[in-house]
Amino acid sequence: MAHGCYWKKCSFGDVSLDYIGRYEGASAAVLADRIEAIVRETGQTGFHFVDEAAPPKSLKALATELIARNTDISWWGNIRFEKTFSPELCELLADSGCIAVSGGLEVASDRLLNLMKKGVSVDQV
């Protein structure tokens, strides 16, 4: 979905590394075009997006595009626990073929999450 990390604030993320510090996202239409090309060329219908974390807005756009195109795939990827990552968004993602997401939960302590600059709370997760 993208190259790099859109958050870039975690205390442990080395944003001096090119693959983390530079964020370049692809549009939902471009991603859907690429997915459809791979399905046509290879017959593969399972996709694992290995972004550092996909923004909820990008996930929503991709899901909407896949549904509009009637693209029949299974996909999964990585997320940050954002306030906008709602049950409704999860339903939309599932409708588009998303079978799983994994989120980075390094600790279950608000104090440590703040020290790590994760930008989330235990309650959000």
Label every PLM stretch briefly.
Residues 32-125:
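Conserved SAM/AdoMet-binding glycine-rich loop
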Residues 1-27:
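Canonical Radical SAM [4Fe-4S] cluster-binding loop centered on the CxxxCxxC motif
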